[in-house]
Amino acid sequence: MQGRGAAEGYHRAGFEVVGVDIVPQPNYPFEFVCMDAIEYLRTHDLSEFDAIHASPPCQAHTKAQALSKGRNNGKYGFHEDFIPQTREILLKIGKPFIIENVDGAPLENPIALYGSQFKNLYTQRKRLFESNIELKTPSTPMVQKKTPTAGNGFGEDGFIAICGSGGVRGMNSRQIPLYWGFALGGIDWMTRAELAEAIPPAYTEFLGKQLIDYIKEQRNNG
């Protein structure tokens, strides 16, 4: 129930990861089930899982709508908001969960994570995370970085905007995915399109360790 970058972060935190997506993911590095994630949650025995991460499609909420409209004569299309039904199902299941989405998504009491709060990340990539357990944010505060808009090269301290499929000033087509992967924290197994949507593994490694601490505490108290 989570994306490729998110999965790597949870793996680093100590989880055994199973990914579920309705779209085939040939580059996914862990066990994978090709199926609608919501249907999977509704119909499968989840007793073997200790926690669930969900990344519902972000197209209904992303600020990249403006970029897409500009390239498609003002057209963007309809995109359903899957967050409410995802939350409803996860609350019924009752296991610790995290729902991730973009800035502007209707998450309830989310925390926000930024690239500048972590070492060795060179993109801000703000993401929101909702949970049914208390999540802490990093002790390092977010630092504003002067980052050019998508396609316009490097900004302060090498920070770059990672999105879209157009050219990037200062890089050729082979260099773009290499630097994007580097900027996201060392991702070297994704395509450019996958990198454009990836969560930095550092985010979910940070959150995954909190999930593991919570799970251990519940077991000790049980």
Regions found by a protein language model. Give the residues of each.
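Helix N-cap at the beta1-alpha1 junction of Rossmann-like dinucleotide-binding domains, i.e.
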Residues: 22-26
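Conserved SAM-binding motif I beta-strand of class I
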Residues: 15-21
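Glycine-rich SAM-binding Motif I of class I
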Residues: 1-8
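Gly/Ala-rich phosphate-binding loop of Rossmann-like dinucleotide-binding domains
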Residues: 11
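Class I S-adenosyl-L-methionine
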Residues: 21, 31-34, 40-52, 58-218
